[in-house]
Amino acid sequence: MELTLWTYEGPPHVGAMRIAASMKGVHYVLHAPQGDTYADLLFTMIERRGKRPPVTYTTFQARDLGGDTAELVKRHIREAVERFKPDALLVGESCTAELIQDQPGALAGGMGFDLPIVSLELPAYSKKENWGASETLYQLVRGLLKNQEINSEGHNPKAWQNQGRRPRVNLIGPSLLGFRCRDDVIEISRLLASHGIDVNTVVPLEATVADVMRLTEADLNICLYAEISESCCSWMERQFGMPFSRTMPIGVGATADFLAEVHGLLGMDPPDPREGEHSSKLPWYSASVDSTYLTGKRVFIFGDGSHVLAAARIANEELGFQVVGLGTYSREMARPVRAAAKELGLEALISDDYLAVEAAMAEAVPELVLGTQMERHSAKRLGIPCAVISTPMHVQDVPARFSPQMGWEGANVIFDSWVHPLMMGLEEHLIGMFRHDFEFVDGHQSHLGHLGGLQSAQVEDAPAAIANNSTETHAIEADTSSVAVATATLEWTMDGEAELKKIPFFVRGKVRRNTEAFAKEKGLNQIDSETLYDAKAHYSA
């Protein structure tokens, strides 16, 4: 067991709550102590929903453990069915209740209710939230569809051609507390409609039990979020022969690939491969003269597996960034993330320890961080600009405006949200011209945050400097708390630091890295001004 101030994912029963709260007519009875009711706040505060999630807690207390807690479970199940009259009932237990082993699912199944009951067995001590959401969706869909007749001729995704209708698809995976899921559904529905494809149903977001029963009426399943929907789509492929798309349409290239894959599976004519050039502004904006400052920017990417893979492709192929760090907290997505990192010449960071992520971020010295809410906090401490690309997120990442991540419009949103935190090229020239002005010293960078964690680092060891400007020194020491990790064996002398400060701060990080690499190569423990000059000559040769 590990004590932490932050976790990227909640326990699996929170994932089950996400599925139940996303749907209509589904109720979740959760065998849990009173302390586990905190999850309600995730939906009312983060998602800003006007109603509580459809969850009934047994809320047992310590004194109940000496009696028959099974009767407590049965009473709450009975009351929930009578009060809410759900079309389907989910029954499970929290991490604490799992230790009691009351088996609430089996109890509910023996109570004789005339409605579908799905028993959830979510191992709280080995799995987490996204897995819990995936397993809940899989068990719910399987429980509702298992008795449907299977077409003896097999499922034909091209049947629409003979039936004289437009092709139909299901959108599987969008849920509450997902990153921009509502807007993604709207954008992908519009995109498919523009290609003559209808959406049969969306599951689980805003879906009813009747919608789930209609899943097999579609020609194709679209797996929008692999963490949530891949297991469900795989089961439907095995059970009913329904194929599903695997490309996540985030970014111009991925959206084009997504359309090509969907058209191919449905037997439609291939789409125009250059559609994205006139449907999204990202290709033109990223190729414009004003955007040449994007090329080579160092970017660190961390989040859930699906969004990390999409972000890495956009950063590398569409914006010309240099990806210097790639990782995920989702162990279920570790394999594809490792493969993507290997293609970029990196070693993937698979961890749910935010301190390890922050240390890797500081060591990589990025100029932009793409991550979760926690990476935004870490980047702020290090003085690095950041854009949130993945859950877990803050309420400010659930905007009132239309702000998808998928499709052509999603590419526009991504360009704006990733590029705006960066310093524009003209700003760099102006700061270079006026860097000696008191308004442009390191302590007055305002909101720019363009500097990497090590670029803004200035270690003031001289007593005179501390006496003259103690406030600035304390700020600098706070920014450079991570530098010691990366340079524990190297020491900058006073004249070396003084010479380094003469270099414009927006390139200072690169000079520092090169000089330290040069010093390590030469076996030096101290870096003075002469070492700095030698390193400059070495890399300029």
UniProtKB/Swiss-Prot annotation:
One GO process term, biological-process aspect: light-independent chlorophyll biosynthetic process
Cofactor descriptive note: Binds 1 [4Fe-4S] cluster per heterodimer. The cluster is bound at the heterodimer interface by residues from both subunits.
Stored InterPro entries: ChlB/BchB/BchZ, LI-POR_suB-like_C, Nase/OxRdtase_comp1, P-CP_red_C, Protochl_reductB, Protochlorophyllide_Rdtase
EC supergroup of this enzyme: oxidoreductase
Cofactor: [4Fe-4S] cluster
Catalytic activity: chlorophyllide a + oxidized 2[4Fe-4S]-[ferredoxin] + 2 ADP + 2 phosphate = protochlorophyllide a + reduced 2[4Fe-4S]-[ferredoxin] + 2 ATP + 2 H2O
Active site: D290 (proton donor)
Family affiliation: Belongs to the ChlB/BchB/BchZ family.
PANTHER family: LIGHT-INDEPENDENT PROTOCHLOROPHYLLIDE REDUCTASE SUBUNIT B
UniProt name for this protein: Light-independent protochlorophyllide reductase subunit B
Species this protein is from: Synechococcus sp. (strain CC9902)
Lineage of source species: Bacteria, Bacillati, Cyanobacteriota, Cyanophyceae, Synechococcales
Gene symbol of the encoding locus: chlB
